[in-house]
């Protein structure tokens, strides 16, 4: 393996939506950082069988819906 061409691979802590934590190795962040998940297998509708909810971060979904609200409506 060539030296100095691969990203740093270190241990981080992943925090699930219910607060449980586990450690894994990753190239994300720095050694000891915490990665807080917004959605995970315990809360995602694909794995829980629930209805889908859209997380609107920064109003992007609402801006899209406002912009294209009448796009396919027939008069």
Curated annotation (Swiss-Prot):
PROSITE patterns per record: RIBOSOMAL_L31
Q: Which GO terms describe its biological process?
A: translation
Q: Give GO cellular component annotations, separated by semicolons.
A: ribonucleoprotein complex; ribosome
Q: One Pfam family for this entry, by name?
A: Ribosomal_L31
Q: Does the keyword Ribosomal protein apply?
A: yes
| Any GO molecular function | structural constituent of ribosome
Q: Which SUPFAM superfamilies match?
A: L28p-like
Top-level taxon:
Bacteria
What keywords sit in the KW lines? Answer: Ribonucleoprotein, Ribosomal protein, RNA-binding, rRNA-binding
Q: Which family does it belong to?
A: Belongs to the bacterial ribosomal protein bL31 family. Type A subfamily.
Protein purpose: Binds the 23S rRNA.
Q: Summarize the subunit comment.
A: Part of the 50S ribosomal subunit.
Q: What is this protein called?
A: Large ribosomal subunit protein bL31
């Amino acid at each position: 393996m060539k030296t100095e061409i691969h990203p740093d691979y270190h241990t981080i802590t992943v925090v699930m939506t219910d607060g449980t934590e586990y450690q894994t190795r990753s190239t994300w962040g720095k050694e000891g950082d915490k990665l807080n998940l917004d959605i995970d297998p315990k809360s995602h509708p694909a794995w829980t069988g629930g209805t889908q909810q859209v997380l609107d971060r920064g109003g992007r979904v609402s801006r899209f819906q406002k912009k294209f609200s009448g796009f396919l409506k027939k008069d």
